[in-house]
């Protein structure tokens, strides 16, 4: 979903009587629609408040354990040998490491023991092979200057719930009951994702953090 789409969908939740029809595939059309809305005194304050609310939503999603898991692989030769263990600088991986797997021609070992020491990943030396680091990537935060066509790289089932969280944040001082109702819808949707998802079942996105 594009950032401009998210803001417009949230605005239509806040103001159910308005209908904003815009060709989201057209970058110019989305920019124009959002610019016109920002110029309207009825909507500008709500749109301005959405940047912080969206970033708070990202933080909330990271705490829920619902984000798609990504992975990247390393050869054992990429690690530094320290006594009977291997050490690797993983400072370029931005997110929470969920597990480490190992494989070679003879064996496959899942959920290897690992520890984190600063920016270093420490694993047992299992010989020559490939280590797969599975992690939940941090969501990049947006700024007030982030454009309407910025892509929020999250599954549709997650982005479809975000307007409820954002609405609950930006109308809290205006209508606390309506804000609570919107947050409840968001939390219910997130709970459904948690109950129905096998997180280890959708690791299809590969982020090339390091060259193997």
Language model features: what each stretch is:
Residues 1-212:
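Glycine-enriched, solvent-exposed interface loops adjoining structured elements
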């Amino acid at each position: 979903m594009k950032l401009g789409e998210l803001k417009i969908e949230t605005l239509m939740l806040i103001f159910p009587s308005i209908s904003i029809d815009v060709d989201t595939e057209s970058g110019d059309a989305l920019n124009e629609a959002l610019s016109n809305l920002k110029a309207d005194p009825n909507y500008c304050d709500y749109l301005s408040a959405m940047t912080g609310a969206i970033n708070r939503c990202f933080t909330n999603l990271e705490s829920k354990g619902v984000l798609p898991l990504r992975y990247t692989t390393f050869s054992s030769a990429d690690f530094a040998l320290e006594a009977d263990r291997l050490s690797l600088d993983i400072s370029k991986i931005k997110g929470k490491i969920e597990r480490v797997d190992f494989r070679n021609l003879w064996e496959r070992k899942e959920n290897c023991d690992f520890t984190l020491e600063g920016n270093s990943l420490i694993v047992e030396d299992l010989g020559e092979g490939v280590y797969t680091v599975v992690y939940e990537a941090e969501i990049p935060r947006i700024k007030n200057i982030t454009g309407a066509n910025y892509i929020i790289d999250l599954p549709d089932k997650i982005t479809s719930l975000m307007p409820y969280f954002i609405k609950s944040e930006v109308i809290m001082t205006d209508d606390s009951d309506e804000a609570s109702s919107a947050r409840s819808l968001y939390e219910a949707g997130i709970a459904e994702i948690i109950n129905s998802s096998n997180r280890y079942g959708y690791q299809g996105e590969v982020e090339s953090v390091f060259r193997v």
